Amino acid sequence: NCSAPLAYHKNRQMLLCHHCGHQLQPVPGLCPACGGKLLYSGFGTQRVEEELAAALPGARILRMDQDSTMQKNAHERMFTRFARQEYDILLGTQMVAKGLDFEKVTLVGVLGIDSMLFGQGFRSYENTFSLITQVVGRGGRAELPGRALIQTAVPEHPVLQLAAGQDYEAFYQEEIAFRKLCLYPPYCAFCVVGFSGSQDGAVFAAAHRFGSILAEQAARQPRLPLRVLGPTPMNIAMLNGKYRYKLTLKCRNDAAFRALMRQTLEEYGEQKLPARASVAIDFNSDGDM
């Protein structure tokens, strides 16, 4: 149903799509579509827990993820037990890095930071810097000294170096210069027009037609700042059986621009296209929907 890979949940012995909820249980030995062998890539919290248990046999490990926190108030109970020192290691996703204060935590580690550093979206550097800054602040919060270990293939990367040094001012100066050069927020606004439907070609044609109408409307207002990129597939090109494309607009999100989009949408709706595609507009987007 989706173009995103399925996530393997070992304790439930199932493959699950975290976008549409589709699941395969039990896990098939071969791909049901092509008959090939299934390959497992990357690592999740369950895989990391296994590696930790093998490396540190006596360690008491508390894992926090979607599977282990499904019950009501599970997060609070786990944090309380860890604070009482019933466990030696707290393993989880980004939730364990934010706003927590355990006075005897002296070592914090981040695995696979490169997936965030080189991830999609213009805020990837900002998000990476923010996460590392939070992580560095988790350890050694009382009298005991703390350390933070960051796993990366590019330790010399400026963002990682600045984050490790907690140099917010230098990071800000580099990031704001980069965004100005690329015309990213705050020097413009991102507006994304998304299209979805059951026929790939029809959805692409609808996105292309909307872009043509927008160009015609914008030509009547030459002083209105606007750049149109696309149509291109969304980051998840198919979601729940629907093909998805987008137009990315660099604009100034003011009354004149919103009036332009309203006119374009009205004219697009009046045209009789062979196959309709649903349209959604995000006026304050990060670049995808």
For each feature predicted by the language model, list its residue ranges.
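Short amphipathic alpha-helices in soluble, non-transmembrane regions
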Residues: 206-213, 259-267
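Short beta-strand elements
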Residues: 218-234, 275-283
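Nucleotide-binding motor/catalytic cores of P-loop/tubulin-like NTPases across gene-expression machines
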Residues: 218-225, 238-243, 268
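Residues at beta-strand starts and edge strands
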Residues: 187-191, 226, 241-245, 275-277
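Generic C-terminus detector
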Residues: 262, 266-289
